[in-house]
Amino acid sequence: MKIVLASKSPRRRELLSNLGLDFEVIESNVEEFSSEKHPSRYVMDLSFNKAMSVAKKLKEEAIVIGADTIVVIEDKVLGKPKDRDEAFIMLKNLQGRVHTVYTGITIVRTKDFKYVSDFEETKVWIKKLEDEEIFNYIDTGEGYDKAGAYAIQGVGALIVEKIEGDYFNVVGLPISKLFDILKREFDVRLL
């Protein structure tokens, strides 16, 4: 069955490619807005909007995967930084503390529009850093298109002290949960 990733995220693309999956990417282009207040419901709502918007456009039978990731610290949602100063403030706020990364995933089968939404959460601790180290990391440029202003799979690995939970969730797609839902709910087997 055709698999479609409803995301422009290069990291999600890379994760699915690393699994050896044959898939197509179709960006959803939906507004990233949800009235949901709880982080898990918020990311599931956004992932649903992305997946369903792409599923409705398809003429052929497919499985559509939508995802959305946010970083939360003390009930404050951190999105992608707008500039260097905002990236510095985010990383300064995250250092020496624990935050939670939430990723919502929604899988839609276009044949009957059956869908399943779920989420994963992972705790991440960022090391205490000198201001110069924070600016040096920001100047790598890799954190600008990522929630929380860092990329655990890149140079950002140097600033992460430890994680508790699914590493791939922090990258942007909880692979194990995706595998389980595809198998259990849609009889799509990746192995």
Swiss-Prot record:
Subcellular location: Cytoplasm
Active-site positions on this chain: 68 (proton acceptor)
GO molecular function: dTTP diphosphatase activity; UTP diphosphatase activity
Source domain of life: Bacteria
Enzymatic reactions: dTTP + H2O = dTMP + diphosphate + H(+); UTP + H2O = UMP + diphosphate + H(+)
Co-factor requirement: a divalent metal cation
EC number(s) given by UniProt: 3.6.1.9
GO-annotated biological processes: nucleotide metabolic process
InterPro entries documented for this protein: ITPase-like_fam, Maf-like
Site entry: Important for substrate specificity: 11, 69, 153
CDD domains tied to this protein: Maf
GO CC, alphabetical: cytoplasm
Entry keyword set: Cytoplasm, Hydrolase, Nucleotide metabolism
Function according to Swiss-Prot or TrEMBL: Nucleoside triphosphate pyrophosphatase that hydrolyzes dTTP and UTP. May have a dual role in cell division arrest and in preventing the incorporation of modified nucleotides into cellular nucleic acids.
Alphabetized NCBIfam families for the sequence: maf
PANTHER family: BIFUNCTIONAL DTTP/UTP PYROPHOSPHATASE/METHYLTRANSFERASE PROTEIN-RELATED, BIFUNCTIONAL DTTP_UTP PYROPHOSPHATASE_METHYLTRANSFERASE PROTEIN-RELATED
Recorded family membership: Belongs to the Maf family. YhdE subfamily.
Protein name: dTTP/UTP pyrophosphatase
The organism of origin for this protein: Thermoanaerobacter pseudethanolicus (strain ATCC 33223 / 39E) (Clostridium thermohydrosulfuricum)
